[in-house]
């Protein structure tokens, strides 16, 4: 393989695309001593920007509740722009579904932890995410849906 045909994977830009924090029950919520229940919802998205530039993002929503009272709500979308060249087309879904999110996630985790601290709460560290397992599950679900659509 010549240098011109070598696979290229470069991070062009990592950035916070969207960030919001709400503390709807402040200041009373700061008097609470119990640990809140945490609910974390996460999604990923990838798309082509042009022939060799791709955008990948992870959106997370973290809701901390004590009973029916919301202590805080954080929504964050961390994104990256990647230059990807000379990667076989059949491998692109894996690069976009596993490789890019694995690079973006640590930055998302840091941003969420920082904003929770700035909102006056103890640090929140998001648990590591196995993007490979999520990718495999999504592929299996798509294959099952395709199989079900063909039988109807």
UniProtKB/Swiss-Prot annotation:
* Annotated GO MF terms: unfolded protein binding
Could you tell me the keywords of this UniProt record?
Answer: Chaperone, Cytoplasm, Protein transport, Translocation, Transport
- Keyword Protein transport among UniProt keywords: yes
**Which InterPro entries does the annotation name?**
SecB, SecB-like_sf
Which NCBIfam families does the record cross-reference, listed alphabetically?
PRK05751.1-3, PRK05751.1-4, PRK05751.1-5, secB
Tell me which family the UniProt entry assigns to this protein: Belongs to the SecB family.
Q: What is the documented function of this protein?
A: One of the proteins required for the normal export of preproteins out of the cell cytoplasm. It is a molecular chaperone that binds to a subset of precursor proteins, maintaining them in a translocation-competent state. It also specifically binds to its receptor SecA.
Which HAMAP family has this protein been placed in?
Answer: SecB
Q: What is this protein called?
A: Protein-export protein SecB
């Amino acid at each position: 393989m010549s240098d011109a045909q070598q696979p290229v994977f470069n991070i062009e830009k990592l950035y916070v695309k969207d960030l919001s924090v709400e503390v709807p029950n402040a200041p009373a919520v700061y008097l609470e001593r119990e640990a809140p229940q945490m609910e974390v919802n996460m999604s990923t998205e990838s798309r082509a920007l042009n022939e060799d530039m791709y955008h990948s993002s992870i959106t997370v929503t973290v809701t901390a509740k004590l009973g029916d009272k919301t202590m805080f709500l954080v929504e964050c979308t961390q994104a990256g722009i990647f230059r990807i060249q000379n990667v076989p087309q059949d491998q692109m879904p894996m690069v976009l579904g596993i490789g890019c999110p694995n690079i973006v996630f640590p930055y998302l985790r840091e941003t969420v932890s920082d904003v929770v601290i700035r909102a006056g709460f103890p640090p929140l560290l998001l648990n590591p995410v196995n993007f490979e397992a999520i990718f495999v599950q999504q592929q299996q679900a798509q294959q099952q849906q395709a199989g079900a659509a063909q039988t109807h």
